[in-house]
Amino acid sequence: MQQGDQTVLSLRPGGGRGNRLFGSSSSSSSLSFGSLSSSDLPLLRPHGGAPASSFPFKGGDSRFDGRERVKYTREQLLELKETTQLSDEILRVQRETAAELFGEEGTWARGESVVSNLVPVQSASRFSEPDSRDWRSRSTQPPPSGEERSWDNLREAKDSRYVEASQYNRQDQPNSQFSRANISSNQGGGPAPVLVKAEVPWSARRGNLSENDRVLKTVKGILNKLTPEKYDLLKGQLIESGITSADILKGVITLIFDKAVLEPTFCPMYAKLCSDINDQLPTFPPAEPGDKEITFKRVLLNICQEAFEGASQLREELRQMSAPDQEAERNDKEKLLKLKTLGNIRLIGELLKQKMVPEKIVHHIVQELLGADEKVCPAEENVEAICHFFKTIGKQLDGNVKSKRINDVYFKRLQALSKNPQLELRLRFMVQNIIDMRSNGWVPRREEMKARTITEIHTEAEKNLGLRPGATANMRRGMVSSGGPVSPGPVYPGGRPGAGGLMPGMPGTRRMPGMPGVDNDNWEVPRTRSMSRRDGPGPLHSPAVSKSASMNTRLLPQGSSGIMSGKTSALLQGSGSVSRPVTVSAERPAQSVAPLTVPVPVEKPQPSGPKLSEEVLQRKTKSLLEEYFNVRLLGEALQCVEELGLPSYHPEFVKEAISLSLEKSPPVVEPIATLLEYLLSKKVVAPKDLETGFLLYGAMLDDIGIDLPKAPNNFGEIVGKLILAGGVDFKLVREIIGKMEDDRFQKMVVDAAVRIVESSEQGKSLLASQAADIEACRNL
């Protein structure tokens, strides 16, 4: 090599210049880029990428133009390798390049020797050695043809090689982990982070449960499915779940107790379950010699006792949580504690009914709740608990002569508490309600909600709606009559959805204007001009065959076929009156039928049947009022009341009408006052009937006002409207408030009546003429 020659030494294979990757573009270079054919390119491109024309190489470097190149053979380069010490920076760049070309896993498996000899060794081996590999056994697909090569294909091939290398390295896990640690530390420039283990690492417990856990898991699943309908089936499964030791027994009882106290409505069912299990499970030996045997009953009572006695301590702990940031947590825990306490009280009462708890324990609980000192007012939570306790077991205790005498002592104390000003007004009303309940033979004013089977629910629905027995079962099966099935699905009024969700003719059903009518055999009757304004298909005179109104009404409420057969009343078919024959038409659009005269059968007058019972009258009253509240048609309501056919029942009707209207949410004061005015003007209801009905309702207002605080005010408004109508006067108001004991309710009734009367010009003169009676009302 001469000094004068301006040559550039290059260590690149082929003596390339500048920033050329594979060689120069000179034609004299044996390994230059221009001298390679397209078939040779894949040997220098392991990934089988695009042809050379697609690579954005620069044509050359102007700094070395016109200078002679020095070419080195493979042997010369290998000699240079043995005597040359590469810096760490160059080695790092080589590793990164190899990782890009062959994948990281391939780099980790090959080691540094492969990286350092990457280009020369690979090219030499591919040129000198024949390809004897078994290409058919390859797991990955061969690279696509030149037309199909793309970056997506390259990425997929790289990913497949990465997965293959990972599977290979997993066979030697320690070496693989070691090599990964080295590579990551070298690439990142520092030691790999230490793996932090969790204190309680996750572990798959499925299939590794102990016998106790398996039984408790089974019992918990059974309790979650337990309902009155499935009680017998699931009770047997629970008994046979594998309760074979005392520890399992205690766990099962704890699950039942926790479930019962959080679901007080189902406490009767859980108490019965405890009684049945206690009778069928065996006893277990004690943990220590000399102790009593472990039985279901003993363990259950111990759990109930611990929960009852520990409630006070838990309340004290909650009172100490006074920090502002603990307020939300304290409120949640107080609600949960109250729910569990009342649920425990309810469960103990139901266990008494099943004879699982002796009466002496019940008396001990009552005495603990009331306290030993009669001059000290018990805690509010204790007063509420004692009310719930007597509501559950009061009738049971009064059934025993000895317990009844003790009950008298308890209720004297409760009588004093009902007037104790230290007690919250809500709790005083609650205590008074229990006292009234006892005086009424332990019959609650309102039916208590309890768990029922589906059959019981259907029976009650049939009773309330006046359906024949078994009708709701047919509805569920999609049957509208005993003779023919219909397509499955809900039964809609008029055979279409969106009409209130009730059956045709049921109280509350109202057809929209313009809807075609439907008769009782589910024939659709197109609306014509001759139909009634009230959307009821009246007598029609159309060129069609008429059919009588003797239709299938067995599944409709008693008296509800009026809407379907042209009658507008909900009581026409069940009140004993003679039904009028009505004809409806079924037009056939495809045929033209000449007018026909069909004789209408005339029913013979039947002798009036026996008088309806009070229960039937109340049911019919409720039905017609519900229908009136929905459709607000005074004429229909008038016809319904007339068809009751019992004027002596009219005072009771007035009372029921007021009661039902004020129990609505919101109360329907204006509609019921309008109805009573209308009945009075039509002389269907006499003024004496109104007075008696008002007095009957006023006598109950003290009790009603506890549950409906606005009832006295709303009742006063109804009375005021009837005073303006001339049906009653303020002398009646004086009699009404004379039957009331609560002075606050008395004032609300008088003020509301006066306010309504003085709102009109006519009322001002009435107030002046009855000023003495008004003053007497205010002085009561």
From Swiss-Prot:
Residues 616-738 form the MI domain. Residues 1-68, 125-154, 166-194, 529-549 are annotated as: Disordered. Coiled coil: none annotated. Residues 216-440 form the MIF4G domain. Residues 166-186 have a biased composition (Polar residues). InterPro entries: ARM-type_fold (IPR016024), Initiation_fac_eIF4g_MI (IPR003891), MIF4G-like_typ-3 (IPR003890). Residues 19-45 have a biased composition (Low complexity). Residues 128-137 have a biased composition (Basic and acidic residues). One of its GO terms (cellular component) is nucleus. It comes from the Eukaryota. Plays a role in the accumulation of some potyvirus during viral infection. This is Eukaryotic translation initiation factor isoform 4G-1.
